[in-house]
């Protein structure tokens, strides 16, 4: 996206200054190639990493569609219009102060800025804005594939461009006219009324009213600048105070909506579990994995420095994720989660030798681990306990060559797949997992959803207890 914008911005500036020359264009592209070469030590590993995971060419994989409506674009002009729910599916993050939005409107009514510049600026704005609505342009700006989380990542480019236009208008504010001010007020008034009728869990009436009041304050300052023919010494401190107030309020309201784990809990958790991890690591000098039957963070293995299975990364290796999913673990495009445990055979194949559980769950109430008769408790630290899997296999072990015939792309039933893997490993026709003969199933607050050879149960009423009786 930086390359696209660099080319766009080069020709934009060249057209404004009317200096599009062959020599200048050659120098620009020559410099761009050198810049790309200097960054190759970083770009090449990233490209290789993405090629094994989420990267794909999807530019022509679907029909041209509209990905969001205008209201989702407008709400991002308001103070505090953000929450953590927008991480995976977010509207365009174009907020960069009400002042910038107003100056952008006034830019097109400023008499000192010639019509050629306005047309060129509008063309660039529209071209970038298309990538917020039309699927083909979104894919074009994002390397021909949709990003995982934090959508519309080129929004910072749009912000940069409109800030430069707003700054140019601010420098020439004395040449703005009152018609532009009236249109700006009407724009924010109509936008406020329009947005107030929508249902957004991160935007309420107080935020909308606050935004409109601040927009009026800016308008008053702009009127003073126009009336007194310039920016006086009083205006600069006043406008600075307004901007600082607005951005501080936006930061506070945005951060307030984000839920964090208490620092005291994390500190206590590390202080308690780290010594336990180190003791467990000292029990064996071979490669093995440690896992938890509760979930504190998605990357606890990195937090506590041990070899684990659970991992969260936006560049997940595709084949690893497929294998983990085929064994029945909870996965997504960015997460592999061990969760509440696995089966003994799968634990053993994956080298999971130690399991950490909470004996008396306080922070993890739903993760009380029920020890199976084959795992032995070897360590205890506070409310945490470590269980050892005596059947854990090393990092490499001999298997029958028939194992090569398996295909993780054809997996339907996880238990059948695990049986096939285990049988092929030892070349024996024996099923570890047996099908239960269930005569009756009673569901309470659950509904069945069939996926190939498996059944998934989903809650009908959230927040209400659900049970399955066999």
Write out the residue ranges for each language-model feature.
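Membrane-interfacial segments
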Residues: 15-19, 50, 54, 58, ...
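Flexible, solvent-exposed extracytoplasmic
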Residues: 346, 351-470
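Hydrophobic transmembrane alpha-helices of multi-pass, membrane-embedded glycosylation machinery
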Residues: 2-14, 48, 106-109, 164
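Periplasmic/ER-lumenal interhelical loops and adjacent helix-loop junctions
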Residues: 24-120, 127, 134-156, 196-205, ...
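Perimembrane helix-loop-helix junctions
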Residues: 2-34, 218-220
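Extracytoplasmic/lumenal acceptor-recognition loop(s) of multi-pass membrane glycoenzymes
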Residues: 242-267, 278-352, 393, 398-439
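Short alpha-helical segments and helix-capping/turn motifs at coil-helix boundaries
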Residues: 87, 103-110, 271-283, 338-343, ...
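Contiguous transmembrane helix-bundle modules in multi-pass membrane proteins
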Residues: 119-139, 145-272
